[in-house]
Structure formats: structure tokens, C-alpha cells
Amino acid sequence: MADEKPAYTKPLPDLRPEDKPFWEALKEHRFLLPRDDKTGEPFWYPRKYAPGTLGETSWMDASGEGTVYTYSTHFIGPSKAYKGDPPHIVALIDLKEGPRMMTILVKDEPGYPSLDPEDVTIGMPVKIVFDDVTDEITMPKFTPAG
């Protein structure tokens, strides 16, 4: 019983048909990006048609590496589920493959606690970590690389 993971009480993403492969890959601890089949360029966020060309899309394996473009320290969460939590860092990450993605910065420790604000810098290299918040949902978060 002591090893039992506490129930996840924070909001979960709304899963849509066009991003189903993304969430399924995360459960396997793989990071995918959608790409434009006409240009081969990856983009973020998943959607049915590619931005710019409105062409068909497919999925590509991605490195899960990037750098912090900008960040904000949030002292109050977006819902009551966050009451009493320490500040968390919401960041825009320039992914190695090109797209920019919004995420949470965390420590690479059990439970993925929030990164301390003083440990974050613009341009800081980061890598993905996979937070298995429920049996169905794994959240992509990022932690300092190296």
C-alpha cells in the first residue's frame, strides 16, 4: 500500500481524434511531432490539416530536446486543484526539430516536482520527461538537460 501512487486530481487534456497518436506514443514514453506531408516540416500543435498548406499530416519521432525560449512563474494555479502547490514554471520550448511548444518545467525526480524559478534561464537546454499521471494519460514535461 505504501508504494501506491496518489490519485491525480489536476485537469486532464481533452483527447481529440487528430492527436490520438501523440497521446498513445507518450504512454510508450515516445515523443512525436506532427508534420506537413507536402513540406516535411514538423509543427506544433497537432491538428487535422497542416498550417500554411492545409495539406495532409503524418507523425514523426522527435528528440524531445530543446531550449527555453521564455518562461513564466505561476504562483496561483488555473484551478482549485492546484491550491497549496508550490509555484510552477510554464515555458515555451524551442524544440530541436523547429516548432515551439508550451510546457511545464520540472525536476527530474520522482513525482516530477516543479523546478525552482531561480534554476531557469532563457536559452537553457532541456529534455523531455514522461509523467505517467494516470493509466491512460502521460504528460510531456521538460527538465534541464545535462
Residue ranges with predicted function:
Residues 1-32:
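A broadly conserved sequence feature marking short terminus-proximal activation segments
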Residues 4, 98, 103-146:
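Well-ordered alpha/beta subsegment
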Residues 26-65:
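Cys/His-rich short segments
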Residues 52-54, 75-80:
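A short, acidic/glycine-rich surface segment
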Residues 65-67, 125:
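Residue-level marker of beta-strand positions
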Residues 71-77, 131-133:
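Short, conserved beta-turn/loop elements at beta-strand boundaries and strand-helix junctions
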Residues 83-101:
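OB-fold (S1/OB) nucleic-acid-binding surfaces
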